[in-house]
Amino acid sequence: MHTKISSASRTAIRLGLTLSLVLLAAVIVVGTTTYAEPDSKNLATVVFVCLHGSVKSQMAAAHFNRIAKERGLPVVAISRGIAVDEKIPASIRERLAGDGLVPASDVPVALTSQQAAAAVKIFAFDEVPADIKGDAEVTYWSDVPPATKDYVRARDAIVRHLEEVVTSMRPHQ
């Protein structure tokens, strides 16, 4: 038994397949830079925190790690959340892939007081509870728009902040 597919449905399927192939080709040609959780004890850690650990902190950590690597900085960024989501939205993964990046972690991870204490710096998009941050100094970036509504504006605001941060850091000698 064969199901008839309308002309409009065939066109939509072809368009979807074409876009998927174009995205795959772009990733292959450009390459996807991966930045995972720090595995070296020799690197200082910067922590980016957003409420759910799934969007802004992921974007900031991924872009920070790219910039730090390009500039030879002995620092790695991680993404953390307060009330973490179960997963990173597909739209954010796709937009990061379009930037040649992947999220800083596979799934959102909650910030612990130990991580806050060990971080050389914490940047947050949302309030970090006092019992988690302890004595750690937190710099808040409240001017970043919602990335799920306007990824480009959010990314550009984050990257502007990151440029200011990395300019103050010394490159690895």
Residue positions per predicted region:
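N-terminal secretory signal peptides that target proteins for export/translocation
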Residues: 1-11
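Bacterial N-terminal signal peptides
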Residues: 16-28
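Phosphate-binding/catalytic loops
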Residues: 28-32, 127-173
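Conserved active-site segments centered on acidic
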Residues: 37-111
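Glycine-rich, N-terminal phosphate-binding loop of Rossmann-like dinucleotide-binding domains
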Residues: 50, 126-127
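A short, aliphatic-rich alpha-helical micro-motif
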Residues: 116-117
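Conserved acidic residues
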Residues: 120-122
